[in-house]
Amino acid sequence: MLEKSKSRKENDRKDRDRSKKENGRRDTTEMRSRVKRCDSEEEERIRIRRDRKSSDFEEEEYERDSKRRGEDKGRGRRERDRDRGKYLKRDRERREREKEKGRKKQKKERSREDCNEESDDVKCGLKRKRTERSRHGDDDVEKKTRDEQVEDEQKQLAEEVEKRRRRVQEWQELKRQNEEAQIESKGPETGKAWTLDGESDDEVKSDSEMDVDRDTKLENGGDAKMVASENETAVTVSENGGDRAADEDEIDPLDAFMNTMVLPEVEKLSNIVIDGILDFKMNGKETGDQAKKGFNKAALGRIIQGEDSDSDYSEPKSDDDPSLDEDDEEFMKRVKKTKAEKLSLVDHSKIEYEPFRKNFYIEVKDISRMTQDAVNAYRKELELKVHGKDVPRPIQFWHQTGLTSKILDTLKKLNYEKPMPIQAQALPIIMSGRDCIGVAKTGSGKTLGFVLPMLRHIKDQPPVEAGDGPIGLVMAPTRELVQQIYSDIRKFSKALGIICVPVYGGSGVAQQISELKRGTEIVVCTPGRMIDILCTSSGKITNLRRVTYLVMDEADRMFDMGFEPQITRIVQNIRPDRQTVLFSATFPRQVETLARKVLNKPVEIQVGGRSVVNKDITQLVEIRPESERFSRLLELLGEWYEKGKVLVFVRSQEKSISDFKSDVCNLLIATSVAARGLDVKELELVVNFDAPNHYEDYVHRVGRTGRAGRKGCAVTFISEDDAKYAPDLVKALELSEQPVPDDVKAVAEGFMAKVKQGIEQAHGTGYGGSGFKFNEEEDEVRKAAKKAQAKEYGFEEEKSDSEDENDVVRKAGGDISQQQITLAQIAAIASAASKAPVTANQLLPNGGGLATEPGIPPTDGAGRVAAMIAAANVQQYLAKIQADAIPEHYEAELEINDFPQNARWKVTHKETLGPISEWSGASITTRGKFYEAGRIPGPEERKLYLFVEGPTEISVKTAKAELKRVLEDITNQTFSLPGGAQSGRYSVL
């Protein structure tokens, strides 16, 4: 029994040991399998992530290759989607196969878990401990290295500070030695000048005082400063504070000093200050140190608005100072520069521009397979005329342009089925990077012809950041056309993520500036407002450095409206290798020659000939006098008002275009300003109440109706007084294949017959330009004519070329130069008096009234001339006596009417005129009346000006020069503000 029980216990013990071992082995296996499972899952996640990246890269590579080869250009959208689906399906199947292989591999690893022993656990534990120890050791090493680096940096910084401190001490010691050497070389100063600073505060200190002050500076570490004030005595302070030897009395020492010393001297100086200023340099001589140092304001105790400030009124200037003799005309030209002149030119040779791509066009096979005869026939069908070398062939469908899918989808949503004639030819040319001139009738889709290539051009360049200028710049003549182009661009730019900003006058400039500062790819603008923006804040708002695509819409109208200087200056500031596009409904020869200066080997496109009215417009021309036009207009309104909108062109604008376009009213009465770019839906009738003054204006007026394939009607009233406009109307009707009324043809033929006979003169085209150019050539011609006239009268040296009537400082009491000229004229014709006795009578003022003076008998020939000379001499002598009786004084004028309002207010205010009058000794008064720009004063009236009068010529010149300086400062401040100088800017519509 005992043996059995022992054997049983032994077996139980063995079973327990065996079970313990099995449990330990099982736990170890589970832990190892769990670790391996985590490692395999991590590997699976990494592999899946790598597969995703590779699939995305392959997908992008596929899209890039397909775009580069142009495989999807000739196929439809369904084929591209089907190929893309097949490719993605194969990729998904490949990824599923790789996942299945990974699962099988995991199963095999789990089946090997029973074969592992406990020794593996021990090895794993030891390995983990070694790894942890090595990691802790690496952390300690890194921490020690970081601390050492910080200590080294602190040591270097301390050494650098010590070096700088030593340099400062050496510099201070060297400066002190130089000052001592200068004082010793000068020797002791004799004499002392009294000033308002007090007796103890001399103008020049003694050597002992300077030494004491210097010692004080050194004791205080070189940081003490000398502070000088008007009523403060110099006090030397020791390092320990020193004792003050000043006792307070019942009377304040400062009050006693002011009452006894300062106030009497101030009264004396106030009596002589004006005389002292006026006598300074008046006699042309200076004495003592003042001849070298100039006028000392502090010596007089007068400091006006801050001493030694450039903006204050300085001492009177000598006669030789060129600023006093500046011509008023040159001053006005310098101060009142236009915004175009203030925009400085850019030297492109000093700027490294980044290269950009122009050519995006790849001709599809359908177009390249066409023969030249087929291309010519297609252009003839579209009524296209092309001038240029290697012109790309016109396209037939939108997908042949090479535009992105987003643009094509937008075209499909807008129901643009196929390109219009101007678009079919312009898109390949502009997409090829060529400069282009597009001439097409109104409503033919010119806007889309330059907008679509611009979007593709912009997407190829790096994105715009804040502070960068635009990439595409579109200029138009009127704000209505700018708004219309902006709305057309917004239809496509929204899908592409491109920002467009309109810049035009008549609206708040603050919002436009904020949008430009944020960065924009496209700017649609009028030339005048764009110049304003570029000049504001010295060009910090935006710039033209990134502009590579320039568009001028209605270019002929911009040149005709006088925007040529602004356009030229803007174009000159854009990089020379830009792409330039010009579009318009009309393009006269004069403007074409001017426009080609800004283009580089352009291709010209014409649709339907040059300046032709759309054939879809029914044109009626009626001969009606002024009295019958209004009743006829009422008949037309009663007939057409219910059919749609009506536009009436007259010489004055009565209604607003915004109400007309927003269906507030169906009738708009406007001038030719509305004839350009105005696109109003459902506009059925156009009435020319007043006949247009040239052919191009008629084409644009009539072109407001019949747009985008719609029908329209145009009625024009003309009378016998408007016969000079009849030939243009007949020409427009004939070119557009419309019937010409017999009475209109008769009026036109009658007028042309009068022109051939020389009775009448044909009017201009409206694009020749008129008025003054205000350039240097015109100034030279005017000065040459003035000089020739003076030479003819024998007074060539009397005045210089730069002098103007208003710039001359003249003596008061009249000028006898006119009488001298009269005498010269009489003497010049004395020799020929017998042949032409009447000539002298015509030259004298008041019709030769001198010959009928009492006591002078009317004679003929030389006797009559001698009598006239004697009478003129008597008048001259009397005028001289009268002038001598009046005290001598001088006067001058300065016109301020055309300056900005702020400048006029400043220069006429008593706070400005008072100090100038007191300082110069001249009297300044405001005369004349303010006239707005464009208004002409009457015969007895004058524009606003300042009248300066003084006892000496130098006083008048000095006062006038100071007034000019004030005007210039305020004018420049006004121009530097956004939208400043409202009175001097051009009208931007």
Swiss-Prot record:
Residues 427-605 form the Helicase ATP-binding domain. The keyword Transcription regulation does not apply. This is DEAD-box ATP-dependent RNA helicase 45. It comes from Arabidopsis thaliana. CDD domains: DEADc_DDX46, KH-I_AtRH42_like, SF2_C_DEAD. The Q motif is unique to and characteristic of the DEAD box family of RNA helicases and controls ATP binding and hydrolysis. The gene is RH45. The keyword Ligase does not apply. PROSITE patterns: DEAD_ATP_HELICASE, HELICASE_ATP_BIND_1, HELICASE_CTER, Q_MOTIF. Residues 88-182 form a coiled coil. Residues 321-330 have a biased composition (Acidic residues). Residues 590-748 form the Helicase C-terminal domain. The modification Phosphoserine is found at residues 119, 200. A motif (Q motif) lies at residues 396-424. Residues 1-248, 305-330 are annotated as: Disordered. Residues 230-239 have a biased composition (Polar residues). Belongs to the DEAD box helicase family. DDX46/PRP5 subfamily. It catalyses: ATP + H2O = ADP + phosphate + H(+).
